[in-house]
Amino acid sequence: MVEYISGVNGVGKTRTLAQAAIMTAQHSKGNVIFVDDTNKLKYELPSNIRLINTEDYMINSSICLCGFLLGLCASDFDLTDVFVDSTTDILALSKTNVDDFMEIIDRVSNATGVNFHFAVCDKHEDTLTYQCV
């Protein structure tokens, strides 16, 4: 499953995604990972959620992020959920390219059984919007 929330900056995407990760980790029988472009959630996420900063791995394109996410799935057979915040900042993509990226990740999800959750900045959406791919 691939789902994402979108909205303008400051509408609460990060907080919503972090809360979803915490709730998921409480009920998950496997591992949960939170990917972000900063360490700002270091003290907000519990220790059973692994926080990964994309800056540490020089991830700056859709190809890099896709390969990184595939590597996470390949290296951890107990991985159930991956949460990715600041997706458009990491990828510097337009909305159209985000849709293409989500389709690729959907194929990864179907092949691995890992659920992916993204926060996407959309300058044209004033409220939080939830979508599944």
Model-predicted regions and their roles:
Residues 1-71, 127-129:
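Conserved P-loop
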